[in-house]
């Protein structure tokens, strides 16, 4: 993955998916939406090239293409994890994940790697109504943007850069989807208006 500078200490790792990166100091960083397990090697290579170790992972929501690698970075690097309340509730256990993914059996939850990887301890839960967060020493703004997922959030870094998760989708993503997944269409449309009204860089 290619590390691209956005502004200040805010970067993005560009590859098959975009992974947010906030550099805390010369050797540590936060990852935002580290994506699927297919990206782990590429992320690690980009971090090694930059001399960075992830100490925290934040996710806008718990879908596999944003959250699946979270447990890996927690177990491998000791990175702290952070998700919004409802998303954290879903990934706390195999049972809670099964409750959310009702069309999968418990046997599938326990044996399909993509599903098993979603189950992960959450060190810092973003409570309802919480709009500011200090995570691994980094002050972040939290913008509630439900719709695509039940408790989707956006993160604004100290550089005033917004990581919008799946509130916004690229033309490539839209072209490849007959109908983009939305948990609640009315909420999703309201959230798009919220993001459009942000004064971020």
Regions found by a protein language model. Name each.
Residues 1-50, 154-165:
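Conserved beta-strand hairpin/beta-sheet module of binuclear metal-dependent hydrolase folds
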Residues 49-52, 133-138, 198-199:
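Glycine-rich phosphate-binding loop signature in dinucleotide/nucleotide-binding domains
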Residues 22-27, 108-109, 168-174:
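Short, basic/glycine-rich phosphate-binding loops at helix/coil junctions
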Residues 2, 11, 53, 80, ...:
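Conserved beta-strand segments of alpha/beta enzyme cores
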Residues 9, 22, 33, 61, ...:
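Divalent metal-coordination and catalytic microenvironments
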Residues 36-37, 139-201:
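Metallo-beta-lactamase
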Residues 38, 45-131:
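Active-site HxH/HxHxD metal-binding segment of metal-dependent hydrolases
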Residues 9, 17-18, 122, 128-131, ...:
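Residue-level marker for the onset of beta-strands and adjacent loop->beta junctions
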């Amino acid at each position: 993955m290619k590390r691209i500078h956005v502004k200040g200490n805010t970067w993005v790792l560009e590859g098959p998916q975009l992974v947010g990166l906030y550099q805390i100091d010369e050797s540590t960083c936060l990852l935002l939406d580290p994506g699927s397990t297919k990206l782990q090697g590429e992320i690690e290579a980009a971090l090694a090239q930059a001399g960075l170790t992830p100490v925290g992972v934040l996710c806008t929501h718990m879908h596999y293409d944003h959250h699946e690698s979270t447990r890996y970075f927690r177990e491998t690097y000791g990175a702290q994890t952070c998700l919004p309340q409802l998303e954290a509730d879903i990934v706390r256990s195999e049972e809670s994940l099964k409750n959310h993914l009702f069309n999968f059996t418990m046997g599938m939850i326990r044996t399909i790697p993509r599903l098993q990887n979603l189950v992960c301890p959450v060190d810092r839960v973003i409570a309802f109504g919480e709009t500011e967060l200090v995570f691994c020493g980094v002050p972040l703004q939290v913008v509630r943007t439900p719709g695509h997922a039940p408790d989707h959030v956006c993160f604004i870094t100290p550089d005033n850069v917004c990581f919008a998760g799946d509130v916004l989708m690229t033309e490539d993503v839209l072209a490849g989807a007959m109908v983009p997944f939305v948990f609640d269409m009315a909420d999703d449309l309201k959230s798009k208006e919220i993001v459009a009204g942000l004064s971020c860089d």
